[in-house]
Amino acid sequence: MSSLPGCIGLDAATATVESEEIAELQQAVVEELGISMEELRHFIDEELEKMDCVQQRKKQLAELETWVIQKESEVAHVDQLFDDASRAVTNCESLVKDFYSKLGLQYRDSSSEDESSRPTEIIEIPDEDDDVLSIDSGDAGSRTPKDQKLREAMAALRKSAQDVQKFMDAVNKKSSSQDLHKGTLSQMSGELSKDGDLIVSMRILGKKRTKTWHKGTLIAIQTVGPGKKYKVKFDNKGKSLLSGNHIAYDYHPPADKLYVGSRVVAKYKDGNQVWLYAGIVAETPNVKNKLRFLIFFDDGYASYVTQSELYPICRPLKKTWEDIEDISCRDFIEEYVTAYPNRPMVLLKSGQLIKTEWEGTWWKSRVEEVDGSLVRILFLDDKRCEWIYRGSTRLEPMFSMKTSSASALEKKQGQLRTRPNMGAVRSKGPVVQYTQDLTGTGTQFKPVEPPQPTAPPAPPFPPAPPLSPQAGDSDLESQLAQSRKQVAKKSTSFRPGSVGSGHSSPTSPALSENVSGGKPGINQTYRSPLGSTASAPAPSALPAPPAPPVFHGMLERAPAEPSYRAPMEKLFYLPHVCSYTCLSRVRPMRNEQYRGKNPLLVPLLYDFRRMTARRRVNRKMGFHVIYKTPCGLCLRTMQEIERYLFETGCDFLFLEMFCLDPYVLVDRKFQPYKPFYYILDITYGKEDVPLSCVNEIDTTPPPQVAYSKERIPGKGVFINTGPEFLVGCDCKDGCRDKSKCACHQLTIQATACTPGGQINPNSGYQYKRLEECLPTGVYECNKRCKCDPNMCTNRLVQHGLQVRLQLFKTQNKGWGIRCLDDIAKGSFVCIYAGKILTDDFADKEGLEMGDEYFANLDHIESVENFKEGYESDAPCSSDSSGVDLKDQEDGNSGTEDPEESNDDSSDDNFCKDEDFSTSSVWRSYATRRQTRGQKENGLSETTSKDSHPPDLGPPHIPVPPSIPVGGCNPPSSEETPKNKVASWLSCNSVSEGGFADSDSHSSFKTNEGGEGRAGGSRMEAEKASTSGLGIKDEGDIKQAKKEDTDDRNKMSVVTESSRNYGYNPSPVKPEGLRRPPSKTSMHQSRRLMASAQSNPDDVLTLSSSTESEGESGTSRKPTAGQTSATAVDSDDIQTISSGSEGDDFEDKKNMTGPMKRQVAVKSTRGFALKSTHGIAIKSTNMASVDKGESAPVRKNTRQFYDGEESCYIIDAKLEGNLGRYLNHSCSPNLFVQNVFVDTHDLRFPWVAFFASKRIRAGTELTWDYNYEVGSVEGKELLCCCGAIECRGRLL
C-alpha cells in the first residue's frame, strides 16, 4: 500500500510534463505560423466546410435526421391507431355485455359454435360451386318469430366479436391465436386439427388437376391409411383432398433453407399472365445469376425467379424428383440433382451459330443472349425465339457429348482398354464445360426433409489432385498408391465434340501431337549458326557436360542479359543486284555466335533493321513491318525475304527468324522476379537452346527426369529409319516450288484423305510456319533428299528447339513452361519426346507407375475416322454449330489482338443487363401459354392469336389436316427442300467407300443391318401424332411437298403436339407412358455407287415414330426401286430419332460387353471431325444392303502392319523432353501436328507443338489434354486453367 501514493505522484508528474510539452509545442506552432491556435482551428474548420465530402456527409446526415423524424411520426401514428382500436374493442365488449344483461343472458368468452342449442350438419356439394349449407336438424315449429330474430341478432354480434378478436390477435402477435379456431368444422367431424406446423384454417397453396397451384385455406386434416390427406378450400371456388407433397406454405422461405433439389412452387410469367407451378431448385443465388434461383419446372421449362416468388412444399418426397409425372423430365432432374455441382453446360456467347433441336429436327439458330445458365436462341428459319437451359441436349454440343460415350463404347468393343476418342480442335465455338460450385455457397441435394439438411456441399476441389502431371512427383506417387487401379493420362489432341473450322485449307485446324520416333542410336541433325550441318550423337555418346550453376537462395532477379540497342546510323540503299557479297561484312566468323538468343532478334544482331510503319486505311490505323537489309534493301513481304536469303546465300539466317506481325516484339524480354531456385539449363546442353528453370514460389527443385530430346523405342518397338523406307526429293531451289518437291507433294496429296477428297495445294509450311493443323500430317525433307538442309524451306521440326523457354513453378498446376520472348503465330515450339511403348506394355506400366504422361500415336485411326466422317460428336461446318459470326468478321482486321477480344461469354458475363427486373426474369416460350391454357380449360383446340408473345414471330395458324401433325417440315425458308437436295447432290462426288458433303465435311455409312437411322434426343408428342412423314409411294411424297410449299409461309408448325422444353428435350406422351432410352444409338449410312442415278425428288426425312414397336427411329421401308431415306440440307435441317435403343447396338453390346476404362491416354490427333449424328440421309436404292452380310468389311490400315490392332504409346514419365511439362488449358495457345521426319511409317510420326496464336513473352504455353470427362471410372480431375472457356473438368 505504501507504493500507491508514489505511483499516483508519478502519474501526476508525468501528466504535468506532458501538458507542458503540449503547451510548448503549441507556442512553437503559433510563433512559426504567426497565428493563434484559435485562428488556426477556425481556418481548419472553414477549409473542412468547403470540402465536397464533408458537405456530402452533412447532407446525408440531414436526410437521415429527416428520415428518422418521419419514421418517428409513423410510429406515433401506428400507436395512435392501436390505441383507438383497443378503445373501440373495449367499447364494443362493454356494449355487448350490456346487451346481454338486458336480455338476461350471461356473456362468456367462448366460441359461438359452443353456444348453439341445436346441432348442425354440413352438406358438401362436390362441384365447382362448392358452397356449405347449414341445415338445422331440430323442430322449426317450436320456435317463435321473436326468438328467431333474437338468435339472428346474437349470431351477428358473435361474428362481430370474433372479427374484432382476430384483429387484436394479429396486432399483438399472440402465439395463442390459433386456439380461437379450434371450434371449427374439423372438431365437429372428429378430424385432426394440427399436423406438425400445419394447422387447420391456415393459409396454404394447393395443386389442382390442371397442374397449376392456387391459394386457399386448409379446412381439414384426415388420416388415410399410413399417411395424411389435407382438404383445401381454394379461394377461387372448389375443394380438393391433397397429399402433403401437393400443398405448399403461403410464405417465402429464407434463402439458406433452399438447396439444389428443393421442391418449391414458383411463379412463372407468360406475357401478362402469372402462373404458379411446381419445380425443383436448380441453382441457388450467386453473383453470376444476379442472386436469383434457377427453377426447373415439372413440364420441362426453366426460369430464373427471385426469393419473393417461391413457396416451399409442405411435405416433399425424400427423392424430390419422384414427384414429377413426366418420366423423361424426372430422369433429367434425377441425373442433374445427383451429379450437382458437376453440371455440363454449353459455353456460349452472343452471335454464335449453333444447331438446336425442335420437334425432332436440328435447326440452324443463333445465340441472342446469355443469362446465367439460360440462353436465348433465335431460330433463323422462322425468327422464333426461345430460352433454353445451357445443359439441355437440345443444343447440339450437349447432344454430341451425351452420345459420344455410346459411340465410343460401340467402337471400342474388344479392346483391352478403352481410351478417350479425341480428335477435334478447340476454337471459339460452343464447347461443353463442367461448372463447379467453387464458391462453396451452393448446397447440394439432400434426400431428407428440407429444414434439416444433412449432406454438406462437396468440397470444390479434391484434397490434392494435381491438375496436370507437373503438380509434383511426390504428390502424384502418393495418389497413385491410394488408387492404383484408377489412373488417368493427358491427351495430346482435342476432343471431337468441340468445334473448329479451317481458314485456308479444306481441313479444320486442330491440336494434334504425335511423338517423333527414332532409335537411341539415331542421330538428329541441327543447324549451327554458321550454317553447317552437325550431327548430334546419341545420349550415351555425349560426354557429361559440366553442371550449370544452381542458385538456392533468394535472388533479386535471375541473371539478366544486356538489352538490345538498335544502331543509330541510317542505312542507305544504292541500286544494285543483291548477291553473296551483300552480307559479307556481317557473316559470322565463329560458330554458335548467338546461340541462346531470341531467334527473332538474331537478324537484328546481324545488322538487319526491323521497322514498324503506320498508315490509315478506311479510317482505321494499320501497322506493317519492314525489314531493311545491311545493303539498304527494304523487304516488305515474306516472299521478298525468302528471295533475298537465297540470292545472298544466307545460311546463318533462316525464314523462321523473320516476322512481319507488328504486334510481335523482338526485344520484349521476360525477367522472373526474386527466384528461390534457379538453374541455367536443365537439359545440360542437350538442346540447342538452354532451358532455364525458375522457382519463384518455394525452394522445391524440378522432378528428376532423364532428359532426352529424341524418342526412344521401348521393348518390342522397331522403327525403320532406313533410307529405303523414305521418299526423297532432288530440289536445288530450297524446295520453294511445291509442285516439284516430292516431299511437299506427299503432304499435298495426303490432303485428299479428307472428306470431299479435295487436294489443298497450299498445305504444309508457309514460310517456315504452320498456320493451322494439317490432319493428314506434314512430310518434311529427310536424309535421302538432295536439298540443302540449311536452305530448305521444308525442314523445321527436325532442327529442334529454337525459341527460348523456361521451366517455372506455377501456383496450382505444378511445373509449367513459359516463353521468354514473343512467339509469332504458326511458329514451331517443341516436340513431345519420350519412350515408345506397345499397347499391352503401356497398360501394365500405366496401372503400376501411372499414366499421366501417356500419349497415343493414333495418326492412322484419326485420319481414317476423319475421312469417313466417322465421329458422331464433331463440329459442324462453318454455317452450323459453333461458328462465331463476330470472330469471322473481325478475325482478319489485324488491329486488335484476337486473344484479348472475349466478350459476352457465359463465364465472364453471365448477365448482360445491369438493371434487371422481375419482368426480365420470365422467359416467353412459344407454346407455353397454349398448352397450359388447354390444361386449364380441358380443351384441345389450337392456340389463339393473343396467346403468344409479340416477339415470337408471325402468328401460328392451325395445321391443315392433310399434313401430319408433328412432322419434320422445316419452317419458312427461301429455298425449297427439292432445290436444296438437288444442289446438295450436285456438289458431292461419288465414291465407293462413302460419300462426303463438301460443305459440311461429313460423310455417312450404313450400319450392318442396312437401315439408315438417325439417332438423337428423345421427343414428346402430347397428343397422338407422329414426328415424321410415313409416306409409301412417290405420289405421296410429291403431294406432301406441294402442301408443304404452299403452307410454308403461313405456318410455323406450332400445334397442341409441339412443346418446347427449356432443359429436357425428351418427354413422352401422357397416355401410355414408357421410359425413353437412356442412351442414343447413333448410326450412319454409306452411299453406294447406285446413288448417282437416284432421283433427287425421292426424299424422305428420317424421323422416329412415337409408337415404334420393334424399330427405333426408322422410317417405313420403301418398296423395291424406291428409297429408304433422304436428306434435306445436312447443315440446315437434321432429323433425330427418339425411339428406344437400337437393336443393333444392343446386340453388339450383349455380344462383347463393355470394357471398363482404367487409364486415359492422350491422342495425337489434331483435327475436328464432322458430326454425322442426327443426319438426314440421301435416298438411294438400298436393296443391295438390306442384309448386313452383303456389305464388304473394310480392313483397317494398321492391320497391314503384320496384323497390328493397337496404336503405340509415348511415355514421358521417366525419360522425355520439355514437352512433358506443358500444362493443360481449355483455351490453349499451342496446337499439335503430326510430322514425318526420319521415317514414313505412318505409325511413328513426330509430335510437334506449334503456336496457334501470337504469344506474349512470359505467357505460359499450354495445350488441350482433351481428356474425356468420365472416361476413368471413379476418378475426377478439376480444371484450374482459368480460361473464359474453361470446361471445369478434365476427367
Swiss-Prot record:
UniProt-annotated stretches for the region Disordered: 108-147, 404-545, 868-1160
Residue positions, PTM Phosphothreonine: 120
Domain SET residues, every copy: 803-1266
UniProt-annotated binding residues for Zn(2+) 4: 1226, 1279, 1281, 1286
Swiss-Prot/TrEMBL catalytic activity: N(6),N(6)-dimethyl-L-lysyl(9)-[histone H3] + S-adenosyl-L-methionine = N(6),N(6),N(6)-trimethyl-L-lysyl(9)-[histone H3] + S-adenosyl-L-homocysteine + H(+)
Location (main, coarse): nucleus
Cross-link Glycyl lysine isopeptide (Lys-Gly) (interchain with G-Cter in SUMO1) per UniProt, renumbered positions: 1032
Chain residues that bind Zn(2+) 2: 729, 743, 781, 785
Expression sites by tissue: Widely expressed. High expression in testis.
Residues covered by the Post-SET domain: 1275-1291
Biased composition (Basic and acidic residues): 1031-1050
GO molecular function, one term: DNA binding
Post-translational changes noted in the entry: Degraded by the proteasome, shielded by interaction with ATF7IP. Monoubiquitinated at Lys-867 by E2 enzymes of the UBE2E family. The conjugated-Ub is protected from deubiquitination by the SET domain. Monoubiquitination at Lys-867 is required for catalytic activity, H3K9 methylation and endogenous retrovirus silencing.
Mutation effect (residue 1224 to K): Abolishes methyltransferase activity
Sections of the chain in a coiled coil: 18-64
Documented EC number(s): 2.1.1.366
Keywords, sorted A to Z: Chromatin regulator, Chromosome, Coiled coil, Cytoplasm, Isopeptide bond, Metal-binding, Methylation, Methyltransferase, Nucleus, Phosphoprotein, Repeat, Repressor, S-adenosyl-L-methionine, Transcription, Transcription regulation, Transferase, Ubl conjugation, Zinc
Residues bound to Zn(2+) 3: 735, 781, 787, 792
Chain positions with N6,N6-dimethyllysine modification: 1170, 1178
Pfam families with a match to the protein in the record: DUF5604, MBD, Pre-SET, SET, Tudor_4, Tudor_5
Cross-link (Glycyl lysine isopeptide (Lys-Gly) (interchain with G-Cter in SUMO2)): 182, 1032, 1038, 1069, 1149
Note: Highly up-regulated in Huntington disease patients, suggesting that participates in the altered chromatin modulation and transcription dysfunction observed in Huntington disease. Its down-regulation has salubrious effects on patients, suggesting that it may be a promising treatment in Huntington disease patients.
Name assigned to this protein: Histone-lysine N-methyltransferase SETDB1
Species annotation: Homo sapiens (Human)
